[in-house]
A protein has these predicted regions:
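Formylglycine-dependent sulfatase
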Residues: 1-99
Length: 99
């Protein structure tokens, strides 16, 4: 499961001591799951980042270079491989990449 939070400062969660943010669900995920303390993206825009996560490719390979660019025809996402292996997959939220 991936939970993506756009435009989210690295420290804007209560478990990191933010004085105003109240994030009990993220706090629970961090204490019972994984919290990456040193993570980054190669392109700080929504769509290119999503395309990289879902394809495993850098932006110059998948060509989603901004938030208005569609994913090129024939682009394969890793959930498609999971589906071929018999897994049920799902997506909730914004997409921004056409199709």
């Amino acid at each position: 499961m991936f939970i993506l939070s756009d435009d989210h400062r690295y420290d804007a969660m209560s478990f990191l001591g933010h004085q105003f943010a109240e994030t009990p669900h993220l706090d629970s995920l961090a204490s019972n799951g994984v919290h990456f303390e040193n993570a980054f993206v190669t392109t700080s825009l929504c769509s290119p980042s999503r395309a990289s996560i879902l394809t495993g490719l850098y932006t110059f390979r998948h060509r989603v270079i901004d938030n208005n660019r569609l994913v090129p025809d024939g682009t394969l996402f890793f959930p498609q491989y999971l589906q071929k292996a018999g897994y049920a997959t799902g997506f909730i939220g914004k997409w921004h990449m056409g199709g």
